[in-house]
């Protein structure tokens, strides 16, 4: 698979909205199977290919490509290197490999790597909290707050919850998350604390966050069903898995006594389908 800089820079943007599912799959397979012979492919080529995979939601394939590169020996632009490491960290968050997250964060701190949105600093604080090093985590968090131009209210809310001694504290789900750079960190912090995930996670990155939403028992069933539908459309789960989730929705006997009234009262199309499934 031979690429040149002109093709990458000129045409990748035009491929952003591929309509054909078959063409979409073939394009992803083409990108993820490139020959990474470092003598024939430049750092910029690698960056464009990996960036395109990441933008298309294929974080695992982007991660696997990066893992084939010896990032210490290849002449990679600093900005590109930081982008590669942010993908590695976010993939580990998305797959909930927290021990690997914390190991990578130590390496990145030693290398003085800068990641967007203070992702590395927040990862360090999160890992210190997991390690019960609360005093150090609090100190670093204070420094983080002082350094941020705009306070990250989502991170602070999650961090404060983790520090709380009251395990039954009421927690309002995070909504309107805009930053893809931090959404995987947020999802991991929510999952480790068994807190609900909002539908915003599905909207922001359905390929990588639908499954965590489905598996989150603390998340409301209407959102889990919505995530399951999206995951099924993206070939992430089978029809049997979707059916099993349909069956797990808890409808009352009273709701089955009057189907017309029940259906009119449900404002979620996916829950309506679950109701029909159980009614059949």
What residues fall within each predicted segment?
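Alpha-helical solenoid repeat scaffolds
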Residues: 1-280
């Amino acid at each position: 698979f031979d690429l040149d800089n002109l093709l990458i820079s000129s045409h990748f943007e035009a491929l952003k909205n591929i309509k054909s599912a078959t063409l979409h799959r073939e394009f992803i397979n083409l990108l993820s199977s490139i020959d990474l012979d470092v003598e024939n492919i430049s750092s910029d080529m690698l960056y464009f290919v990996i960036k395109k995979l990441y933008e298309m939601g294929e974080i695992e394939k982007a991660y696997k490509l990066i893992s084939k590169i010896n990032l210490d020996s290849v002449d990679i632009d600093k900005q590109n290197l930081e982008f590669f490491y942010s993908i590695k960290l976010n993939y580990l968050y998305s797959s909930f490999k927290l021990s690997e997250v914390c190991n990578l964060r130590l390496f990145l701190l030693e290398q003085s790597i800068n990641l967007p949105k203070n992702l590395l600093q927040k990862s360090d604080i999160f890992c210190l909290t997991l390690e019960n090093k609360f005093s150090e985590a609090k100190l670093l968090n204070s420094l983080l707050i002082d350094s941020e131009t705009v306070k990250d209210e989502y991170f602070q809310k999650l961090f404060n919850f983790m520090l709380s001694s009251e395990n039954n504290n009421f927690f309002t789900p995070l909504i309107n998350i805009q930053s893809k750079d931090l959404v995987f960190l947020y999802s991991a912090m929510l999952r480790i604390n068994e807190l609900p995930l909002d539908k915003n996670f599905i909207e922001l990155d359905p390929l990588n966050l639908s499954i965590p939403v489905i598996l989150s028992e603390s998340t409301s069933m209407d959102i889990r069903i919505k995530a399951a539908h999206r995951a099924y459309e993206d070939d992430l789960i089978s029809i049997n898995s979707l059916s099993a989730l349909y069956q797990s929705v808890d409808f009352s006997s009273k709701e089955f006594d009057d189907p017309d009234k029940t259906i009119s009262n449900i404002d979620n199309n996916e829950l309506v389908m679950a109701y029909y499934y159980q009614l059949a």
